[in-house]
């Protein structure tokens, strides 16, 4: 177990394939968390409690959140308010996975033509990292593609309060 793990990650390639998360599973989970429609067959094939379950469900209101970030950075390129907060219960029960989202906030900022971000995770199991980094990369890419000019994904400052090997 590592407490307060942090790392800067270049986001020009955010695909980390593993046996648990082959490329298609990564794409399905990211699409789902971006609020896109996915088939029931894909849900059956790829979704499981071990792969993140409800702790990894970040999609609530995601379309509006993405639009808000794009509007914020378009009107105010140096804004400190380009933040996506993942919904959490204000009075969480420690026994509820729904109340314990792993990803808590992502702060976005422009540095020239690069869209950078800082992500705060409550917890990260190393074997689930490929799914989370793929989603964050897809989210940064989606926002960058909707900004004026040739904005590209830049650097992610990744912070996890606790890093463990697996979900056991």
Residue ranges of predicted features:
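Terminal, non-catalytic protein-protein interaction segments that mediate quaternary/complex assembly
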Residues: 1-168
């Amino acid at each position: 177990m590592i407490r307060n793990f942090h790392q800067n990650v270049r986001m020009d390639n955010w695909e980390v394939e593993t046996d648990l998360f082959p490329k298609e599973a990564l794409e399905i989970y990211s699409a789902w968390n971006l609020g896109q429609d996915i088939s029931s067959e894909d849900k059956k094939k790829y979704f499981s409690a071990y792969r993140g379950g409800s702790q990894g469900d970040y999609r609530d209101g995601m379309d509006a959140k993405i639009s808000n970030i794009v509007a914020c950075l378009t009107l105010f390129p140096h804004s400190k308010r380009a933040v996506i907060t993942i919904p959490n219960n204000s009075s969480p029960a420690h026994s509820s996975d729904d109340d314990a989202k792993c990803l808590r906030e992502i702060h976005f900022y422009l540095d020239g033509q690069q869209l950078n971000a800082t992500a705060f995770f409550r917890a990260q199991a190393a074997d689930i990292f490929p799914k989370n980094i793929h989603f964050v990369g897809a989210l940064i890419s989606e926002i960058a593609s909707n900004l004026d000019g040739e904005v590209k994904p830049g650097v992610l400052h990744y912070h996890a309060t606790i890093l463990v090997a697996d979900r056991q």
